[in-house]
Amino acid sequence: MHFKNVTLIILICLSFYLPGLFTIPALDRDEARFAQASKQMLESGNFVDIRFQEEPRYKKPAGTYWLQAASVNLLSPSKLKEIWPYRIPSLLAAIIAVIGTYFLANVFLRPPGGIIAAIILSSTPLLIGEAHMAKSDALLLASVVIAQFGLIRTYRNHVSWLNWL
């Protein structure tokens, strides 16, 4: 049952998130800054001191840059100037957030509720936009949904040693 639903959710997400992912130019100035900082990280080989040109980018999550650099390195190491490889972590994170919402909603709702919640989240214009941008927002959403799922599972299963959460 879950396999069919998750497959359906992934297909729905891809139908919303793939159109334009490879062709639309940078949508936001912060997207360009994330991509440029990740590009500089790959060119310099310095994965600790994250910079946009000469300005440090210490206020943004470092994991975003690392995932973007890994994505570019795996998918198109010779095409550092194209924006689409930098967007793949956001695309995957948006899909993970939607799948996480499905499982989280299944804890509270009857079976069609989880799939409906996932479809509603996947079709929101904000998440569609974030899945198309090389920024940290979709990654942060995925981490929050996963954390919420872990918390509700801990609460529902009465795992006493995790009550400190």
Kindly label every feature range from the protein language model:
Residues 1-165:
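Membrane-integral, polyisoprenol-dependent glycosyltransferases
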